[in-house]
């Protein structure tokens, strides 16, 4: 009992003195050329530690080339079963009829959306065997092109389509040895603490979030870098029309000198999914 109490006391002391750890995840690489450039910029000049790539997206081939230029970047497969934008679309990479709309694209939404009635995957007769076929095809293509893939994530929450899909995604992650689940490792998701409409809003709310991080705990912050270019201004869907300005704000925040300075001052340790996996193995 004495030794147990000493161990618990030592663990508690370590948790209080260890720095906060933060994964900064940039999602949706591949949806546009400018999006690819933004993620590259946020990794090279900013604080991004993990990058999520959408395999069926139109700019995936360019993403593969860009990721080869940054071999130390941690990369995850952002499994996708939807194609949400009105002016740019992507299709499954496998033969999975129940996941396609009448034009052969993924449905724009995963869950029912008043702006897209009847056009959510959940509202249509999808089949689990098609989901498995598509997930496997995306994973295998990603591993072929980017062998260092470390983990999976899920675009627009597609794994929440049903408990069956969630279990399938977990099974495949283990089968392909890319099973890192932050939730199972005690990682806390964090968001902007305050308004996030403009670049300045994002910056101040991100700094406020950083200020709230506690010693000894591990956190995950997710957003979508982009650039305010003509290309991205043409990418939108009903209910999210300001994509370019919004995602430029993410890039501005993640590359802002004040953010890096604050992280250094507070002693926050930036880590990746792969770091999380390595640290778990070493325990």
Language-model features and meaning:
Residues 3-13:
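Sec-dependent N-terminal signal peptides
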């Amino acid at each position: 009992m004495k030794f147990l109490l000493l161990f618990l006391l030592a663990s508690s002391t370590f948790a209080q003195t260890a720095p906060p750890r933060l994964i900064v995840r940039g999602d949706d690489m591949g949806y546009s050329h400018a999006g690819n450039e933004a993620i590259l910029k946020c990794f090279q000049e900013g604080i991004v530690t993990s990058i999520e790539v959408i395999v069926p997206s139109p700019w995936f081939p360019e993403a593969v080339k860009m990721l080869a230029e940054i071999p130390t970047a941690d990369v995850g497969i952002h499994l996708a079963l939807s194609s949400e934008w009105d002016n740019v679309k992507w299709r499954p990479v496998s033969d999975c009829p129940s996941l396609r709309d009448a034009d052969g694209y993924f449905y724009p939404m995963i869950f029912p959306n008043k702006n897209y009635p009847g056009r959510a995957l959940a509202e249509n007769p999808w089949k689990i065997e098609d989901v498995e076929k598509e997930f496997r095809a995306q994973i295998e293509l990603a591993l072929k092109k980017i062998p260092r893939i470390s983990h999976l994530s899920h675009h627009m929450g597609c794994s929440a389509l049903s408990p069956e899909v969630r279990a399938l995604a977990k099974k495949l992650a283990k089968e392909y040895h890319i099973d890192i689940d932050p939730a199972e490792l005690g990682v806390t998701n964090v968001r902007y603490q305050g308004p996030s409409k403009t670049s300045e809003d994002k910056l101040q709310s991100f700094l406020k979030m950083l200020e709230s991080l506690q010693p000894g705990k591990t956190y995950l912050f997710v957003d979508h870098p982009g650039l305010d270019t003509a290309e991205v201004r043409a990418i939108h869907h009903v209910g999210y029309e300001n994509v370019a300005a919004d995602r430029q704000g993410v890039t501005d925040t993640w590359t802002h000198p004040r953010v890096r300075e604050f992280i250094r001052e507070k002693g926050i340790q930036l880590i990746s999914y792969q770091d999380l996996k390595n640290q778990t193995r070493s325990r």
